[in-house]
Amino acid sequence: MTATPLYRQDTIAAIATPPGRGGVGIIRLSGPASRDLAERILGHCPAPRHAHYGPFYDADAQVLDEGIALFFPGPHSFTGEDVLELQGHGGPVIMDLLLARCVALGARLARPGEFSERAFLNDKLDLAQAEAIADLIDASSRAAAENALRSLQGEFSTRVSALVDKLIELRMFVEAAIDFPEEEIDFLADGKVAAMLQGAQETLGEVRAAAGQGALMREGMNVVIAGRPNAGKSSLLNALTERDSAIVTDIEGTTRDVLREYIHIDGMPLHVIDTAGLRDTPDAIEKIGVARAWEEIEKADRVLLLVDATTTTQTDPMQLWPEFVARLPHPERLTLVRNKIDESGETEQSDLSTSPPIVRLSAKTGLGVDNLKEHLKAVMGFDATTEGRFSARRRHLDALDRAGDALDNGIAQLRGHGAGELLAEDLRDAQQALSEITGEFTADDLLGEIFGSFCIGK
């Protein structure tokens, strides 16, 4: 990348505040004509980084509005270019007139996310930080906002960059052993590279775990309530959402489709999904509901297998329902929930150290529901203090997984054959995968997809 702005010919403009009426509306401009536009609209260019109050003029020198103007000369601005902000009254008509005035003077309308894209291309922030801006805007809880802010401040990027530096150092030793085989010290044979590779793999695992939690905090964990008809699945959904989200009756097969609710538990986002009772049925509509239930179960982050505690004392899912367990793609994501303990006489004591964990509750009375909430927080890795965490996306997890696979291959090569050339290739693959996170190696179409999801004016 270059330290000088890449966009030298055009200046972009956009309304940076949300649509509708408001006390203040902001027009943002970035590009080489920003200073000239300031002089044409304000009559002069404000002193850099000083707020100036005054009128905004149209082409006939008539006052369109009055407000505050701020000028940030590049490269010391958000985008790295000359930036002008016009803060006027937040009515749609005023904002449209001001924006039209900017366009008439030569600015063009910005694409969604183009300001952040220019900041990225001009080395003002990396790709993970740019994505964190959108995550901060979209945050649905305080914890998610705090994670996004840490990513914006560089927490995620710093950890990824440290990993890349380790891989570069590893490549130096490996390629030295390949290029200079006559040297007395063989880094591949003396264990130094193996130790460094193992350390890099462990560090990558730590970053991957933190990123996984960050992605869950950003996107929310998918929790699917599954079980036979009349086990109390809809009642549990209502208990978790604390409202009548689903119809509850004693008639089997009342729920025939997937019901989704988005909730927070102490700031932790959850997508709770109620499903049709699982059974063989001749009813064509109910069959569709059962098929959809299995679709949700198979992609869930957590499956709550709800059992009517009045019908069985069994707590082993393999004994209760071996066909269900056998079909699960991730049995380790299962929690057994024994419902209706108000009728069975069981206590609300949970057995969370068993496999799978067991939670006892009454969805009808609410007894034990708080224990289930705490269990969900625990399996998600959520706690009140989110220090050291950061926001992450699915594409970041994919890149980390590919880097991990490459390191695994490298370790196998080293242990099996000591093949330096193959190890060097694996290290390059891992480095490139990690560099995609910060944007050092990123395809143009991916950049377009990422920044295209931003707000206009960001």
UniProtKB/Swiss-Prot annotation:
NCBIfam families: mnmE_trmE_thdF (TIGR00450), PRK05291.1-3 (NF003661), small_GTP (TIGR00231). GTP binds at residues 230-235, 249-255, 274-277. This is tRNA modification GTPase MnmE. The gene is mnmE. (6S)-5-formyl-5,6,7,8-tetrahydrofolate binds at R28, E85, K124, K458. Mg(2+) binds at S234, T255. CDD domains: trmE, TrmE_N. The keyword Membrane does not apply. The lineage of its organism: Bacteria, Pseudomonadati, Pseudomonadota, Gammaproteobacteria, Oceanospirillales. It comes from Chromohalobacter salexigens (strain ATCC BAA-138 / DSM 3043 / CIP 106854 / NCIMB 13768 / 1H11).
